[in-house]
From Swiss-Prot:
Gene Ontology terms: biological process: protoporphyrinogen IX biosynthetic process
Protein name (record): Glutamate-1-semialdehyde 2,1-aminomutase
Gene field: hemL
Similarity field: Belongs to the class-III pyridoxal-phosphate-dependent aminotransferase family. HemL subfamily.
Keyword Isomerase: yes
Keyword terms: Cytoplasm, Isomerase, Porphyrin biosynthesis, Pyridoxal phosphate
Organism of provenance: Stutzerimonas stutzeri (strain A1501) (Pseudomonas stutzeri)
Cofactor(s) of this protein: pyridoxal 5'-phosphate
Enzyme superclass (EC): isomerase
A cellular-component GO term for this protein: cytoplasm
């Protein structure tokens, strides 16, 4: 019995499902989740001392690779001064100034402790600013686990939301309209009928929670136009894409400016953190300036600020994101070549340093339906074959993968060697 198996059995006694976030349980792929004890560079090491090339990256934050020495040094220096103060710090202001400089749409910013807090607060702010209750989100997009966002589409584009988690009252869900991602016509029709009720549209500019689905040409631009026409606040959820697909996030990559944005993951350098911000006129509605309440005991935690500031400074060097994207492209092309050689229907998607893998014969992946039509059972087999080969992919056919600047030629060779053997066994 492996150490991970022993630990997982023990964990299930006191932790629901043995994990503190559902995807970690390996329910989508089967088997026992890896229990990790160390990480360095492009690698994670499990409790049985096996090393894996890591394409999960703690679900996105580790863009520099694990245990980057300059990030660790920054955290150690802060440790000498205390863990948490519950009071303003100079680093919070420094972080706010840096974020506003890197992301010009962010005229003001509020720090929080998670991406869920950031999206929840941004939606509350949009509702307070507009005086409207309804929100629009998109099928397959995930914005954290707050009640009004755990909603799936009903039996039609204009059907009111239905809770997709037990414990979410129908009265919460009824204000959430869930539409098809990349279907601008559906958004236009919905706003034509209900626009005066809609406070905001929240969207992942690259849908990273149904694998990795880029926006169709004109989709984000169309959302901007429709929001302007109907007085709706446009929120980009950049918890995943922020500072990863480009230094200025997906809004810089695609050239579309939202009213509010949410960030997390990279902004904390691996520490628990998030933020939301945007137009000054909207942000000034937040307490203590305005009537929209938001607060947090650990918001702006100094350890998180130290790690985040150092991370953002390091990824700001010229050429960083070009290098990250180039490695990702080489890796994906290598996977595609080996799948083609084995006669396996396979397609990939990429935006910068995030990517998607699909066992599908489709020419492209554009919609939630395209994702759901891919062969999830074949992905399960591929996942475990890659794991045997020393490569750790996201343990779900519906999650994006992430590269880091620590990935290089050695990691590429390990990855493609494992993939060649895996595809051969999948024939």
């Amino acid at each position: 019995m492996s150490r991970s198996e022993t630990l997982f059995a023990s964990a299930q006694t006191h932790i629901p499902g043995g994990v503190n976030s559902p995807v970690r349980a390996f329910r989508s792929v089967g088997g026992t989740p890896l229990f990790l004890k160390h990480a360095e560079g492009a690698y994670v090491i499990d409790e049985d001392d096996k090393r894996y090339v890591d394409y999960v990256g703690s679900w996105g934050p580790m863009i520099l690779g694990h245990s980057h020495p300059q990030v660790l040094d920054a955290v150690r220096r802060q440790l000498e001064h205390g863990l948490s103060y519950g009071a303003p710090t100079a680093m919070e202001t420094e972080m706010a100034e840096l974020v506003c400089r890197l992301v010009p749409s962010m005229e003001m910013v509020r720090m929080v402790s998670s991406g869920t807090e950031a999206t929840m607060s941004a939606i509350r702010l949009a509702r307070g600013y507009t005086g409207r209750d309804a929100i629009i989100k998109f099928e397959g997009c995930y914005h954290g686990h707050s009640d009004s966002l755990l909603v799936k589409a009903g039996s039609g584009a204009l059907t009111q939301g239905v809770p997709s988690s037990a414990g979410v009252p129908a009265d919460f869900a009824k204000h959430t309209l869930t539409l098809a991602y990349n279907d601008l016509d559906e958004v236009e029709a919905t706003l034509k009928e209900k626009g005066e009720q809609v406070a905001c549209i929240i969207v992942e500019p690259v849908a990273g929670n149904m694998n990795c689905v880029p926006p169709a040409p004109g989709f984000l631009e169309g959302l901007r136009r429709l929001c302007d026409a109907h007085g709706v606040v446009l929120i980009f959820d950049e918890v995943m894409t922020g500072f990863r697909v480009a230094l200025g996030g997906a809004q810089a990559y695609y050239g579309v400016t939202p009213d509010l944005s949410t960030f997390g993951k990279i902004i904390g350098g691996g520490m628990p953190v998030g933020c939301f911000g945007g137009k000054r006129a909207i942000m000034e509605r937040i307490a203590p300036l305005g009537p929209v309440y938001q607060a947090g005991t650990l918001s702006g935690n100094p350890l998180a600020m130290a790690a985040g500031l150092t991370t953002l400074e390091l990824i700001s060097r010229p050429g960083f994101h070009d290098e990250l994207g180039a490695y990702t492209s080489r890796m994906l092309q290598g996977l595609q070549d080996r799948a083609d050689a084995a006669g396996i229907p396979f397609v990939t998607t990429q935006v910068g340093g995030m990517f998607g893998l699909y066992f599908s014969g489709a020419d492209d992946i554009v919609t939630f339906a395209d994702v759901m039509a891919s062969d999830a059972d074949r992905f399960k087999r591929f996942f475990h074959l890659m794991l045997e080969g020393g490569v750790y992919l996201a343990p779900s056919a519906f999650e994006a993968g992430f590269t880091s600047i620590a990935h290089g030629d050695k990691e590429l060779a390990i990855t493609l060697d494992a993939a060649e053997r895996a595809f051969a066994k999948l024939k």
